[in-house]
Swiss-Prot record:
Originating organism: Stutzerimonas stutzeri (strain A1501)
EC number(s) stated in the UniProt entry for this protein: 4.1.99.17
Pathway: Cofactor biosynthesis; thiamine diphosphate biosynthesis
Residue segments, region Disordered: 1-21
Entry function: Catalyzes the synthesis of the hydroxymethylpyrimidine phosphate (HMP-P) moiety of thiamine from aminoimidazole ribotide (AIR) in a radical S-adenosyl-L-methionine (SAM)-dependent reaction.
Chain coiled-coil ranges: none
The protein's name: Phosphomethylpyrimidine synthase
Catalysed reactions listed for this entry: 5-amino-1-(5-phospho-beta-D-ribosyl)imidazole + S-adenosyl-L-methionine = 4-amino-2-methyl-5-(phosphooxymethyl)pyrimidine + CO + 5'-deoxyadenosine + formate + L-methionine + 3 H(+)
Family note: Belongs to the ThiC family.
Subunit text: Homodimer.
Any one annotated GO CC term: cytosol
Binding site for Zn(2+): H429, H493
Domain of life: Bacteria
InterPro entries tied to this protein: ThiC, ThiC-associated_dom, ThiC/Bza_core_dom, ThiC/BzaA/B
Protein backbone atom coordinates (compact mmCIF):
# COMPACT_ATOMS: atom_id res chain seq x y z
CA UNK A 1 0.00 0.00 0.00
CA UNK A 2 1.67 3.22 -1.08
CA UNK A 3 0.09 6.62 -0.60
CA UNK A 4 1.38 10.17 -0.37
CA UNK A 5 0.71 11.40 3.17
CA UNK A 6 -0.98 14.61 1.99
CA UNK A 7 -3.68 12.82 -0.02
CA UNK A 8 -7.12 11.73 1.09
CA UNK A 9 -6.69 8.10 2.10
CA UNK A 10 -10.32 7.24 1.37
CA UNK A 11 -9.66 8.16 -2.27
CA UNK A 12 -6.04 7.17 -2.80
CA UNK A 13 -5.21 4.15 -0.62
CA UNK A 14 -3.82 1.16 -2.50
CA UNK A 15 -3.26 -2.42 -1.44
CA UNK A 16 0.34 -3.58 -1.17
CA UNK A 17 0.84 -5.51 -4.42
CA UNK A 18 3.34 -7.94 -2.89
CA UNK A 19 0.71 -9.07 -0.39
CA UNK A 20 -1.87 -10.12 -2.97
CA UNK A 21 0.31 -12.34 -5.16
CA UNK A 22 -0.80 -15.98 -5.02
CA UNK A 23 1.80 -18.42 -3.77
CA UNK A 24 3.44 -20.50 -6.54
CA UNK A 25 1.53 -23.63 -7.58
CA UNK A 26 -1.08 -22.79 -4.95
CA UNK A 27 -4.77 -22.05 -5.14
CA UNK A 28 -7.29 -20.80 -2.61
CA UNK A 29 -9.93 -23.42 -1.88
CA UNK A 30 -13.03 -23.16 0.30
CA UNK A 31 -14.47 -26.02 2.34
CA UNK A 32 -18.24 -25.82 2.71
CA UNK A 33 -19.83 -26.09 6.16
CA UNK A 34 -23.39 -26.92 7.20
CA UNK A 35 -24.75 -23.65 5.78
CA UNK A 36 -23.89 -21.87 2.53
CA UNK A 37 -22.18 -18.94 4.24
CA UNK A 38 -19.70 -21.14 6.11
CA UNK A 39 -16.88 -21.25 3.55
CA UNK A 40 -13.55 -22.02 5.18
CA UNK A 41 -10.46 -20.91 3.23
CA UNK A 42 -7.37 -23.06 2.85
CA UNK A 43 -4.38 -23.12 0.53
CA UNK A 44 -3.88 -26.14 -1.71
CA UNK A 45 -0.37 -26.76 -3.09
CA UNK A 46 -0.24 -28.75 -6.33
CA UNK A 47 2.69 -31.12 -6.75
CA UNK A 48 4.52 -32.51 -9.76
CA UNK A 49 4.36 -36.15 -10.79
CA UNK A 50 7.17 -38.28 -9.40
CA UNK A 51 9.85 -38.75 -12.13
CA UNK A 52 9.70 -42.05 -13.98
CA UNK A 53 13.07 -43.02 -12.47
CA UNK A 54 11.25 -43.25 -9.13
CA UNK A 55 8.02 -44.85 -10.24
CA UNK A 56 6.17 -42.02 -11.95
CA UNK A 57 3.36 -41.80 -9.39
CA UNK A 58 0.93 -38.89 -9.08
CA UNK A 59 1.40 -36.86 -5.90
CA UNK A 60 -1.77 -35.61 -4.23
CA UNK A 61 -1.98 -31.88 -3.48
CA UNK A 62 -1.19 -30.76 0.07
CA UNK A 63 -3.64 -28.55 1.97
CA UNK A 64 -2.17 -26.03 4.41
CA UNK A 65 -3.61 -23.55 6.92
CA UNK A 66 -4.10 -20.13 5.36
CA UNK A 67 -4.22 -16.83 7.28
CA UNK A 68 -3.99 -14.53 4.25
CA UNK A 69 -7.73 -14.02 3.86
CA UNK A 70 -9.04 -12.90 0.46
CA UNK A 71 -5.77 -11.13 -0.34
CA UNK A 72 -4.30 -14.19 -2.10
CA UNK A 73 -7.51 -15.14 -3.90
CA UNK A 74 -7.21 -13.93 -7.53
CA UNK A 75 -11.00 -14.13 -7.86
CA UNK A 76 -11.52 -11.41 -5.23
CA UNK A 77 -11.09 -7.72 -5.98
CA UNK A 78 -9.29 -6.02 -3.09
CA UNK A 79 -10.06 -2.39 -2.28
CA UNK A 80 -8.63 -1.33 1.07
CA UNK A 81 -10.69 1.87 0.89
CA UNK A 82 -13.85 -0.22 1.28
CA UNK A 83 -12.46 -2.96 3.50
CA UNK A 84 -13.00 -6.70 3.27
CA UNK A 85 -16.28 -8.46 2.55
CA UNK A 86 -18.61 -9.31 5.42
CA UNK A 87 -18.29 -12.87 6.74
CA UNK A 88 -20.22 -13.02 10.03
CA UNK A 89 -23.10 -10.52 10.10
CA UNK A 90 -25.75 -13.09 9.20
CA UNK A 91 -24.54 -15.44 11.95
CA UNK A 92 -24.68 -12.65 14.52
CA UNK A 93 -28.10 -11.39 13.41
CA UNK A 94 -29.55 -14.92 13.43
CA UNK A 95 -28.80 -15.22 17.14
CA UNK A 96 -31.15 -12.33 17.87
CA UNK A 97 -29.33 -11.11 20.99
CA UNK A 98 -27.67 -7.95 19.64
CA UNK A 99 -28.85 -4.54 18.49
CA UNK A 100 -27.49 -1.96 16.08
CA UNK A 101 -26.70 1.31 17.83
CA UNK A 102 -27.65 4.66 16.24
CA UNK A 103 -23.99 5.68 16.34
CA UNK A 104 -20.79 5.52 18.36
CA UNK A 105 -21.41 5.78 22.10
CA UNK A 106 -17.89 6.49 23.37
CA UNK A 107 -17.20 10.18 23.92
CA UNK A 108 -13.78 9.99 22.25
CA UNK A 109 -15.15 8.11 19.23
CA UNK A 110 -17.84 10.72 18.72
CA UNK A 111 -15.31 13.53 19.03
CA UNK A 112 -13.02 11.98 16.40
CA UNK A 113 -15.92 11.34 14.05
CA UNK A 114 -17.01 14.98 14.27
CA UNK A 115 -13.52 16.40 13.76
CA UNK A 116 -13.47 17.76 10.19
CA UNK A 117 -9.68 17.98 10.20
CA UNK A 118 -9.50 14.18 10.33
CA UNK A 119 -11.65 13.59 7.26
CA UNK A 120 -8.64 13.15 4.95
CA UNK A 121 -7.35 10.15 6.88
CA UNK A 122 -10.62 8.66 8.14
CA UNK A 123 -11.85 5.32 6.81
CA UNK A 124 -14.84 6.35 4.70
CA UNK A 125 -17.20 3.50 5.47
CA UNK A 126 -17.59 3.65 9.25
CA UNK A 127 -20.57 1.51 10.28
CA UNK A 128 -22.84 1.88 13.26
CA UNK A 129 -21.66 -0.54 15.94
CA UNK A 130 -23.54 -3.50 17.36
CA UNK A 131 -23.92 -4.33 21.07
CA UNK A 132 -25.62 -7.04 23.14
CA UNK A 133 -29.21 -6.39 24.06
CA UNK A 134 -29.86 -5.62 27.73
CA UNK A 135 -29.27 -8.61 30.04
CA UNK A 136 -27.66 -10.61 27.22
CA UNK A 137 -24.19 -12.09 26.90
CA UNK A 138 -22.89 -12.57 23.34
CA UNK A 139 -19.57 -14.29 24.03
CA UNK A 140 -18.63 -17.55 22.35
CA UNK A 141 -18.00 -18.95 25.83
CA UNK A 142 -21.57 -18.12 26.87
CA UNK A 143 -22.99 -19.97 23.87
CA UNK A 144 -20.63 -22.89 24.44
CA UNK A 145 -21.69 -23.26 28.08
CA UNK A 146 -25.32 -23.34 26.92
CA UNK A 147 -24.47 -26.23 24.59
CA UNK A 148 -24.79 -24.16 21.41
CA UNK A 149 -22.43 -24.87 18.50
CA UNK A 150 -22.12 -21.53 16.71
CA UNK A 151 -21.11 -21.09 13.05
CA UNK A 152 -17.80 -19.73 14.40
CA UNK A 153 -17.19 -23.04 16.21
CA UNK A 154 -18.01 -25.11 13.15
CA UNK A 155 -15.78 -22.84 11.05
CA UNK A 156 -12.72 -23.33 13.25
CA UNK A 157 -13.27 -27.11 13.45
CA UNK A 158 -13.18 -27.34 9.66
CA UNK A 159 -10.19 -25.00 9.57
CA UNK A 160 -8.15 -26.94 12.14
CA UNK A 161 -8.68 -30.26 10.35
CA UNK A 162 -7.34 -28.98 7.00
CA UNK A 163 -9.03 -31.83 5.07
CA UNK A 164 -7.25 -34.41 7.24
CA UNK A 165 -9.53 -37.29 6.21
CA UNK A 166 -8.80 -36.67 2.52
CA UNK A 167 -5.07 -36.45 3.25
CA UNK A 168 -5.14 -39.84 4.97
CA UNK A 169 -7.01 -41.37 2.02
CA UNK A 170 -4.42 -39.92 -0.37
CA UNK A 171 -1.59 -41.56 1.59
CA UNK A 172 -0.09 -38.28 2.79
CA UNK A 173 0.07 -39.45 6.39
CA UNK A 174 1.61 -42.89 6.18
CA UNK A 175 4.10 -41.88 8.86
CA UNK A 176 3.59 -39.63 11.90
CA UNK A 177 5.43 -39.84 15.20
CA UNK A 178 3.25 -40.15 18.28
CA UNK A 179 4.59 -37.07 20.04
CA UNK A 180 4.60 -36.10 23.73
CA UNK A 181 1.77 -33.74 24.65
CA UNK A 182 2.43 -33.33 28.39
CA UNK A 183 -1.17 -34.05 29.34
CA UNK A 184 -2.93 -32.18 26.53
CA UNK A 185 -6.10 -33.89 25.28
CA UNK A 186 -5.58 -33.66 21.51
CA UNK A 187 -8.16 -35.73 19.58
CA UNK A 188 -7.52 -37.53 16.30
CA UNK A 189 -10.05 -35.26 14.64
CA UNK A 190 -11.28 -31.78 15.58
CA UNK A 191 -15.09 -31.72 15.61
CA UNK A 192 -17.44 -28.77 16.20
CA UNK A 193 -18.53 -30.41 19.45
CA UNK A 194 -14.92 -30.67 20.62
CA UNK A 195 -14.44 -26.97 19.84
CA UNK A 196 -17.58 -26.13 21.82
CA UNK A 197 -16.46 -28.18 24.82
CA UNK A 198 -12.99 -26.61 24.88
CA UNK A 199 -14.39 -23.07 24.70
CA UNK A 200 -16.93 -23.88 27.44
CA UNK A 201 -14.16 -25.28 29.62
CA UNK A 202 -12.02 -22.16 29.12
CA UNK A 203 -9.17 -24.14 27.56
CA UNK A 204 -9.63 -22.33 24.25
CA UNK A 205 -10.88 -18.99 22.97
CA UNK A 206 -12.35 -17.81 19.67
CA UNK A 207 -11.53 -14.07 19.61
CA UNK A 208 -14.40 -12.67 17.55
CA UNK A 209 -15.85 -9.25 18.39
CA UNK A 210 -19.38 -8.89 17.02
CA UNK A 211 -18.22 -5.66 15.32
CA UNK A 212 -15.42 -7.40 13.42
CA UNK A 213 -17.60 -9.09 10.85
CA UNK A 214 -14.80 -9.35 8.26
CA UNK A 215 -13.14 -11.90 10.54
CA UNK A 216 -12.35 -15.47 9.48
CA UNK A 217 -12.74 -17.22 12.87
CA UNK A 218 -9.79 -19.02 14.45
CA UNK A 219 -9.14 -20.69 17.80
CA UNK A 220 -6.40 -20.44 20.43
CA UNK A 221 -5.90 -23.35 22.84
CA UNK A 222 -3.37 -26.01 23.84
CA UNK A 223 -5.37 -28.80 22.15
CA UNK A 224 -5.32 -27.03 18.80
CA UNK A 225 -2.61 -25.96 16.36
CA UNK A 226 -0.11 -23.57 17.97
CA UNK A 227 -0.81 -20.06 16.73
CA UNK A 228 1.43 -17.02 16.31
CA UNK A 229 0.82 -13.30 16.73
CA UNK A 230 2.51 -10.48 14.85
CA UNK A 231 2.76 -6.94 16.19
CA UNK A 232 2.32 -3.77 14.17
CA UNK A 233 1.70 -0.17 15.17
CA UNK A 234 2.95 3.35 14.69
CA UNK A 235 4.89 5.42 17.20
CA UNK A 236 5.62 9.08 17.81
CA UNK A 237 8.83 8.61 15.80
CA UNK A 238 7.35 7.37 12.57
CA UNK A 239 5.13 5.12 10.45
CA UNK A 240 1.84 6.08 8.84
CA UNK A 241 -1.62 4.55 8.53
CA UNK A 242 -0.89 3.19 5.07
CA UNK A 243 2.35 1.60 6.25
CA UNK A 244 0.55 -0.14 9.11
CA UNK A 245 -2.12 -1.57 6.79
CA UNK A 246 0.67 -2.78 4.51
CA UNK A 247 2.35 -4.48 7.49
CA UNK A 248 -0.96 -6.14 8.34
CA UNK A 249 -1.47 -7.59 4.87
CA UNK A 250 2.19 -8.59 4.65
CA UNK A 251 2.13 -10.28 8.05
CA UNK A 252 -0.97 -12.37 7.42
CA UNK A 253 0.43 -13.41 4.04
CA UNK A 254 3.29 -15.16 5.80
CA UNK A 255 1.19 -16.73 8.52
CA UNK A 256 0.32 -14.38 11.36
CA UNK A 257 -2.79 -15.88 13.01
CA UNK A 258 -3.60 -12.70 14.94
CA UNK A 259 -2.22 -9.17 14.81
CA UNK A 260 -1.79 -6.74 17.67
CA UNK A 261 -1.98 -3.02 16.91
CA UNK A 262 0.41 -1.46 19.42
CA UNK A 263 0.20 2.08 18.04
CA UNK A 264 1.34 4.80 20.42
CA UNK A 265 1.67 7.77 18.06
CA UNK A 266 -0.85 10.11 16.49
CA UNK A 267 -4.18 9.05 15.03
CA UNK A 268 -4.43 5.75 16.94
CA UNK A 269 -8.22 5.68 16.49
CA UNK A 270 -8.12 6.20 12.72
CA UNK A 271 -5.24 3.75 12.22
CA UNK A 272 -7.14 1.05 14.09
CA UNK A 273 -10.29 1.52 11.99
CA UNK A 274 -8.34 1.00 8.77
CA UNK A 275 -6.62 -2.07 10.20
CA UNK A 276 -9.78 -3.78 11.49
CA UNK A 277 -11.81 -3.14 8.35
CA UNK A 278 -9.05 -4.76 6.28
CA UNK A 279 -8.20 -7.65 8.60
CA UNK A 280 -9.41 -11.26 8.22
CA UNK A 281 -7.58 -12.19 11.45
CA UNK A 282 -8.34 -11.17 15.06
CA UNK A 283 -6.95 -7.79 16.11
CA UNK A 284 -5.68 -7.23 19.63
CA UNK A 285 -4.74 -3.97 21.35
CA UNK A 286 -3.38 -2.65 24.63
CA UNK A 287 -6.03 -0.01 25.52
CA UNK A 288 -3.87 1.59 28.21
CA UNK A 289 -1.54 2.87 25.45
CA UNK A 290 -4.29 4.96 23.90
CA UNK A 291 -5.59 6.01 27.30
CA UNK A 292 -2.12 7.34 28.11
CA UNK A 293 -2.08 9.34 24.86
CA UNK A 294 -5.35 10.95 25.93
CA UNK A 295 -3.67 12.33 29.09
CA UNK A 296 -0.56 13.47 27.17
CA UNK A 297 1.61 10.67 28.51
CA UNK A 298 1.15 11.49 32.21
CA UNK A 299 0.36 8.14 33.86
CA UNK A 300 -0.75 9.78 37.10
CA UNK A 301 -3.62 11.49 35.24
CA UNK A 302 -5.22 8.24 34.11
CA UNK A 303 -8.71 7.56 35.46
CA UNK A 304 -11.10 4.63 35.39
CA UNK A 305 -13.70 6.75 33.56
CA UNK A 306 -11.28 7.62 30.75
CA UNK A 307 -10.11 4.01 30.47
CA UNK A 308 -13.69 2.73 30.40
CA UNK A 309 -14.51 5.08 27.51
CA UNK A 310 -11.41 3.80 25.69
CA UNK A 311 -12.58 0.18 26.08
CA UNK A 312 -16.00 1.03 24.64
CA UNK A 313 -14.43 3.04 21.81
CA UNK A 314 -12.24 0.12 20.76
CA UNK A 315 -14.94 -2.52 21.30
CA UNK A 316 -17.29 -0.58 19.02
CA UNK A 317 -14.61 -0.54 16.32
CA UNK A 318 -14.26 -4.32 16.51
CA UNK A 319 -11.10 -5.10 18.52
CA UNK A 320 -11.15 -8.84 19.27
CA UNK A 321 -8.96 -9.01 22.37
CA UNK A 322 -7.63 -6.53 24.90
CA UNK A 323 -4.39 -6.83 26.82
CA UNK A 324 -5.36 -5.68 30.31
CA UNK A 325 -2.61 -5.36 32.94
CA UNK A 326 -4.92 -5.98 35.89
CA UNK A 327 -2.43 -8.19 37.75
CA UNK A 328 0.10 -5.43 38.47
CA UNK A 329 -0.80 -4.92 42.12
CA UNK A 330 0.66 -2.32 44.44
CA UNK A 331 2.21 -4.98 46.69
CA UNK A 332 4.14 -6.55 43.80
CA UNK A 333 5.90 -3.37 42.66
CA UNK A 334 8.57 -3.40 45.44
CA UNK A 335 9.45 -6.98 44.42
CA UNK A 336 10.92 -5.58 41.18
CA UNK A 337 13.33 -3.19 42.93
CA UNK A 338 16.32 -5.55 42.90
CA UNK A 339 15.78 -6.78 39.36
CA UNK A 340 18.49 -6.29 36.77
CA UNK A 341 16.00 -4.78 34.31
CA UNK A 342 13.09 -3.76 36.54
CA UNK A 343 9.66 -3.52 34.89
CA UNK A 344 10.03 -3.82 31.11
CA UNK A 345 6.36 -4.03 30.10
CA UNK A 346 5.05 -0.66 28.91
CA UNK A 347 1.61 -1.42 30.30
CA UNK A 348 3.09 -2.76 33.50
CA UNK A 349 5.24 0.31 34.06
CA UNK A 350 2.29 2.64 33.38
CA UNK A 351 0.13 0.92 35.99
CA UNK A 352 3.00 0.63 38.49
CA UNK A 353 3.62 4.35 38.20
CA UNK A 354 -0.10 5.10 38.70
CA UNK A 355 -0.27 2.84 41.78
CA UNK A 356 2.77 4.48 43.37
CA UNK A 357 1.66 8.02 42.53
CA UNK A 358 -1.76 7.54 44.12
CA UNK A 359 -0.75 4.83 46.59
CA UNK A 360 -3.88 3.01 45.54
CA UNK A 361 -4.58 -0.41 44.11
CA UNK A 362 -4.52 -0.78 40.32
CA UNK A 363 -7.86 0.50 39.01
CA UNK A 364 -7.88 -2.24 36.36
CA UNK A 365 -7.96 -4.74 39.22
CA UNK A 366 -10.54 -2.93 41.35
CA UNK A 367 -12.87 -2.39 38.36
CA UNK A 368 -12.29 -5.83 36.81
CA UNK A 369 -15.91 -6.99 37.03
CA UNK A 370 -17.04 -3.78 35.34
CA UNK A 371 -14.55 -4.51 32.56
CA UNK A 372 -16.12 -7.97 32.22
CA UNK A 373 -19.52 -6.35 31.66
CA UNK A 374 -18.09 -4.43 28.69
CA UNK A 375 -16.28 -7.47 27.29
CA UNK A 376 -19.35 -9.71 27.22
CA UNK A 377 -21.48 -7.03 25.54
CA UNK A 378 -19.22 -7.14 22.45
CA UNK A 379 -17.48 -10.52 22.85
CA UNK A 380 -14.03 -9.08 23.39
CA UNK A 381 -11.59 -11.62 24.83
CA UNK A 382 -9.20 -10.90 27.67
CA UNK A 383 -5.48 -11.24 27.14
CA UNK A 384 -4.45 -10.77 30.75
CA UNK A 385 -1.16 -8.90 30.52
CA UNK A 386 2.04 -9.93 32.25
CA UNK A 387 3.09 -6.45 33.30
CA UNK A 388 5.80 -7.88 35.56
CA UNK A 389 7.35 -10.27 33.05
CA UNK A 390 11.15 -10.63 33.25
CA UNK A 391 13.13 -8.47 30.84
CA UNK A 392 16.35 -10.41 31.31
CA UNK A 393 17.17 -14.03 32.06
CA UNK A 394 18.58 -12.88 35.42
CA UNK A 395 15.04 -11.89 36.46
CA UNK A 396 13.28 -15.03 35.20
CA UNK A 397 10.79 -16.85 37.45
CA UNK A 398 11.11 -14.39 40.32
CA UNK A 399 8.58 -13.51 43.03
CA UNK A 400 7.16 -10.54 41.11
CA UNK A 401 6.52 -12.57 37.96
CA UNK A 402 4.91 -15.51 39.71
CA UNK A 403 2.99 -13.33 42.16
CA UNK A 404 1.34 -11.59 39.23
CA UNK A 405 0.64 -14.95 37.57
CA UNK A 406 -1.25 -16.12 40.64
CA UNK A 407 -3.36 -12.95 40.50
CA UNK A 408 -4.04 -13.55 36.80
CA UNK A 409 -5.36 -16.97 37.79
CA UNK A 410 -7.81 -15.32 40.20
CA UNK A 411 -8.92 -12.87 37.51
CA UNK A 412 -9.39 -15.71 35.01
CA UNK A 413 -11.96 -17.31 37.28
CA UNK A 414 -13.80 -13.97 37.61
CA UNK A 415 -13.84 -13.61 33.80
CA UNK A 416 -15.19 -17.16 33.46
CA UNK A 417 -17.91 -16.38 36.01
CA UNK A 418 -19.07 -13.74 33.51
CA UNK A 419 -18.59 -16.16 30.56
CA UNK A 420 -15.87 -13.92 29.15
CA UNK A 421 -13.15 -15.59 27.09
CA UNK A 422 -9.67 -15.27 28.53
CA UNK A 423 -6.04 -16.06 27.73
CA UNK A 424 -2.94 -15.35 29.80
CA UNK A 425 0.19 -13.54 28.66
CA UNK A 426 3.61 -14.86 29.64
CA UNK A 427 7.32 -14.07 29.45
CA UNK A 428 9.68 -12.78 28.29
CA UNK A 429 13.30 -13.75 28.99
CA UNK A 430 13.72 -17.28 30.41
CA UNK A 431 16.69 -19.67 30.06
CA UNK A 432 15.82 -23.05 28.59
CA UNK A 433 15.94 -25.05 31.82
CA UNK A 434 13.40 -22.72 33.47
CA UNK A 435 10.82 -22.66 30.66
CA UNK A 436 8.79 -25.72 31.65
CA UNK A 437 8.29 -24.34 35.16
CA UNK A 438 6.55 -21.34 33.57
CA UNK A 439 4.18 -23.57 31.61
CA UNK A 440 3.44 -25.87 34.53
CA UNK A 441 2.76 -22.98 36.89
CA UNK A 442 0.50 -21.25 34.38
CA UNK A 443 -1.55 -24.43 33.89
CA UNK A 444 -1.87 -24.76 37.64
CA UNK A 445 -2.68 -21.11 38.47
CA UNK A 446 -4.93 -20.40 35.49
CA UNK A 447 -6.68 -23.77 35.19
CA UNK A 448 -5.51 -24.42 31.61
CA UNK A 449 -6.64 -21.09 30.15
CA UNK A 450 -4.63 -20.55 26.92
CA UNK A 451 -1.08 -19.28 27.47
CA UNK A 452 0.32 -16.61 25.13
CA UNK A 453 4.03 -15.85 25.43
CA UNK A 454 6.55 -13.42 23.97
CA UNK A 455 9.20 -15.95 23.04
CA UNK A 456 10.60 -16.51 25.59
CA UNK A 457 14.12 -15.34 24.76
CA UNK A 458 16.60 -17.94 26.00
CA UNK A 459 19.68 -15.70 26.16
CA UNK A 460 20.38 -11.96 26.23
CA UNK A 461 23.63 -11.85 24.24
CA UNK A 462 22.37 -11.55 20.66
CA UNK A 463 20.86 -8.15 19.77
CA UNK A 464 19.91 -8.30 16.10
CA UNK A 465 19.22 -12.03 16.37
CA UNK A 466 16.52 -12.12 19.03
CA UNK A 467 14.13 -13.76 16.59
CA UNK A 468 16.44 -16.77 16.97
CA UNK A 469 17.05 -16.52 20.73
CA UNK A 470 13.29 -16.32 21.23
CA UNK A 471 12.37 -18.84 18.55
CA UNK A 472 14.22 -21.50 20.55
CA UNK A 473 12.19 -20.73 23.65
CA UNK A 474 8.97 -20.42 21.64
CA UNK A 475 9.36 -23.92 20.17
CA UNK A 476 9.96 -25.34 23.63
CA UNK A 477 7.06 -23.64 25.41
CA UNK A 478 4.77 -24.40 22.46
CA UNK A 479 5.63 -28.07 22.90
CA UNK A 480 4.97 -27.86 26.64
CA UNK A 481 1.47 -26.46 26.04
CA UNK A 482 1.59 -22.76 25.12
CA UNK A 483 -1.31 -21.94 22.78
CA UNK A 484 -0.01 -18.82 21.01
CA UNK A 485 3.46 -17.39 20.46
CA UNK A 486 4.04 -13.67 20.01
CA UNK A 487 6.68 -13.18 17.37
CA UNK A 488 9.96 -11.37 17.93
CA UNK A 489 11.72 -9.70 15.00
CA UNK A 490 15.46 -9.10 14.47
CA UNK A 491 14.82 -5.47 15.50
CA UNK A 492 13.67 -6.42 19.03
CA UNK A 493 15.29 -4.05 21.56
CA UNK A 494 16.75 -2.03 18.66
CA UNK A 495 14.02 -0.29 16.66
CA UNK A 496 10.71 -0.50 14.79
CA UNK A 497 10.58 -3.46 12.38
CA UNK A 498 10.18 -2.94 8.63
CA UNK A 499 8.48 -5.35 6.21
CA UNK A 500 11.50 -7.62 5.91
CA UNK A 501 11.80 -7.82 9.68
CA UNK A 502 8.11 -8.68 9.99
CA UNK A 503 8.48 -11.52 7.49
CA UNK A 504 11.61 -12.85 9.21
CA UNK A 505 9.89 -12.80 12.59
CA UNK A 506 6.79 -14.55 11.31
CA UNK A 507 8.66 -17.29 9.44
CA UNK A 508 10.83 -17.91 12.51
CA UNK A 509 7.73 -18.30 14.66
CA UNK A 510 5.89 -20.44 12.10
CA UNK A 511 8.85 -22.81 12.36
CA UNK A 512 8.64 -22.78 16.17
CA UNK A 513 4.87 -23.34 16.18
CA UNK A 514 5.05 -26.16 13.64
CA UNK A 515 7.92 -27.82 15.50
CA UNK A 516 5.75 -27.71 18.63
CA UNK A 517 2.79 -29.25 16.76
CA UNK A 518 5.03 -32.08 15.57
CA UNK A 519 6.41 -32.66 19.06
CA UNK A 520 2.90 -32.73 20.56
CA UNK A 521 1.75 -35.22 17.92
CA UNK A 522 -0.99 -32.97 16.58
CA UNK A 523 -3.03 -34.97 14.03
CA UNK A 524 -1.85 -34.25 10.50
CA UNK A 525 1.04 -32.03 11.56
CA UNK A 526 3.53 -34.21 9.68
CA UNK A 527 1.75 -34.19 6.32
CA UNK A 528 3.70 -31.24 4.95
CA UNK A 529 7.03 -32.58 6.25
CA UNK A 530 6.41 -35.97 4.64
CA UNK A 531 5.47 -34.39 1.32
CA UNK A 532 8.52 -32.13 1.28
CA UNK A 533 10.86 -34.97 2.27
CA UNK A 534 9.49 -37.13 -0.55
CA UNK A 535 9.96 -34.25 -3.00
CA UNK A 536 13.52 -33.79 -1.76
CA UNK A 537 14.35 -37.47 -2.20
CA UNK A 538 12.90 -37.44 -5.72
CA UNK A 539 14.70 -34.20 -6.66
CA UNK A 540 11.43 -32.39 -7.33
CA UNK A 541 12.97 -28.99 -6.72
CA UNK A 542 9.92 -26.85 -7.49
CA UNK A 543 7.83 -28.90 -5.07
CA UNK A 544 10.49 -28.47 -2.40
CA UNK A 545 10.34 -24.70 -2.81
CA UNK A 546 6.56 -24.52 -2.92
CA UNK A 547 5.94 -26.76 0.09
CA UNK A 548 8.22 -24.62 2.23
CA UNK A 549 7.09 -21.81 4.51
CA UNK A 550 8.94 -19.31 2.30
CA UNK A 551 9.12 -20.49 -1.33
CA UNK A 552 10.71 -17.23 -2.51
CA UNK A 553 13.75 -17.48 -0.26
CA UNK A 554 14.23 -21.20 -0.87
CA UNK A 555 14.19 -20.66 -4.64
CA UNK A 556 16.54 -17.67 -4.40
CA UNK A 557 19.08 -19.59 -2.30
CA UNK A 558 19.05 -22.51 -4.74
CA UNK A 559 19.44 -20.21 -7.74
CA UNK A 560 22.43 -18.36 -6.27
CA UNK A 561 24.65 -21.31 -7.19
CA UNK A 562 22.52 -23.20 -9.72
CA UNK A 563 20.53 -20.53 -11.58
CA UNK A 564 19.75 -22.43 -14.79
CA UNK A 565 16.31 -23.97 -15.22
CA UNK A 566 17.96 -27.32 -15.94
CA UNK A 567 19.27 -27.33 -12.36
CA UNK A 568 15.70 -27.54 -11.10
CA UNK A 569 15.41 -31.07 -12.50
CA UNK A 570 18.95 -32.13 -11.60
CA UNK A 571 19.56 -35.05 -9.26
CA UNK A 572 21.91 -33.06 -7.02
CA UNK A 573 22.34 -29.66 -5.42
CA UNK A 574 25.36 -27.37 -5.05
CA UNK A 575 26.26 -28.61 -1.58
CA UNK A 576 27.47 -32.11 -2.54
CA UNK A 577 27.45 -31.98 -6.32
CA UNK A 578 26.57 -34.84 -8.68
CA UNK A 579 29.15 -37.37 -7.39
CA UNK A 580 28.53 -37.21 -3.65
CA UNK A 581 24.77 -36.78 -3.26
CA UNK A 582 23.69 -39.12 -0.46
CA UNK A 583 20.15 -39.38 -1.81
CA UNK A 584 21.40 -40.21 -5.31
CA UNK A 585 23.64 -42.92 -3.87
CA UNK A 586 20.70 -44.34 -1.91
CA UNK A 587 18.64 -44.45 -5.09
CA UNK A 588 21.43 -46.32 -6.88
CA UNK A 589 21.48 -48.87 -4.07
CA UNK A 590 17.73 -49.33 -4.44
CA UNK A 591 18.06 -49.73 -8.22
CA UNK A 592 20.76 -52.37 -7.73
CA UNK A 593 18.50 -54.21 -5.28
CA UNK A 594 15.61 -54.16 -7.74
CA UNK A 595 17.77 -55.40 -10.64
CA UNK A 596 19.12 -58.30 -8.58
CA UNK A 597 15.86 -59.27 -6.90
CA UNK A 598 16.97 -58.18 -3.43
CA UNK A 599 14.27 -56.85 -1.09
CA UNK A 600 16.54 -55.81 1.78
CA UNK A 601 18.66 -52.67 1.23
CA UNK A 602 21.39 -53.83 3.62
CA UNK A 603 21.64 -57.11 1.71
CA UNK A 604 21.83 -55.11 -1.51
CA UNK A 605 24.73 -53.09 -0.12
CA UNK A 606 26.49 -56.28 1.01
CA UNK A 607 25.87 -57.90 -2.37
CA UNK A 608 27.30 -54.86 -4.11
CA UNK A 609 30.41 -55.02 -1.92
CA UNK A 610 30.81 -58.74 -2.69
CA UNK A 611 30.47 -58.08 -6.42
CA UNK A 612 33.13 -55.38 -6.33
CA UNK A 613 35.38 -57.68 -4.25
CA UNK A 614 35.13 -60.42 -6.87
CA UNK A 615 36.03 -57.97 -9.63
CA UNK A 616 39.08 -56.84 -7.64
CA UNK A 617 40.25 -60.43 -7.14
CA UNK A 618 39.55 -61.39 -10.75
CA UNK A 619 41.71 -58.46 -11.78
CA UNK A 620 44.69 -59.90 -9.92
CA UNK A 621 44.21 -58.00 -6.62
CA UNK A 622 46.29 -55.16 -8.04
CA UNK A 623 45.74 -51.80 -6.32
CA UNK A 624 47.00 -49.70 -9.23
CA UNK A 625 46.40 -50.62 -12.87
CA UNK A 626 48.04 -49.26 -15.97
CA UNK A 627 45.42 -47.51 -18.14
Amino acid sequence: MSVQSNKNLSESAQVDQQSIQPFPRSQKIYVQGSRPDIRVPMREISLDVTPTDFGGEINAPVTVYDTSGPYTDPNVTIDVRKGLADVRSAWIEDRGDTEKLPGLTSEFGQRRLNDAELSAMRFAHVRNPRRAKAEHNVSQMHYAKKGIITPEMEYVAIRENMKLAEAREAGLLVEQHAGQSFGAAIPKEITPEFVRSEVARGRAIIPANINHTELEPMIIGRNFLVKINGNIGNSALGSSIEEEVAKLTWGIRWGSDTVMDLSTGKHIHETREWIIRNSPVPIGTVPIYQALEKVNGVAEDLTWELFRDTLIEQAEQGVDYFTIHAGVLLRYVPLTAKRVTGIVSRGGSIMAKWCLAHHKENFLYTHFEEICEIMKAYDVSFSLGDGLRPGSIADANDAAQFGELETLGELTKIAWKHDVQCMIEGPGHVPMHMIKENMDKQLECCDEAPFYTLGPLTTDIAPGYDHITSGIGAAMIGWFGCAMLCYVTPKEHLGLPNKDDVKTGIITYKIAAHAADLAKGHPGAQIRDNALSKARFEFRWEDQFNLGLDPDTARAFHDETLPKESAKVAHFCSMCGPKFCSMKITQEVREYAAEHGLTDEQKAIEAGFAEQSSRFKDGGSVIYKQV
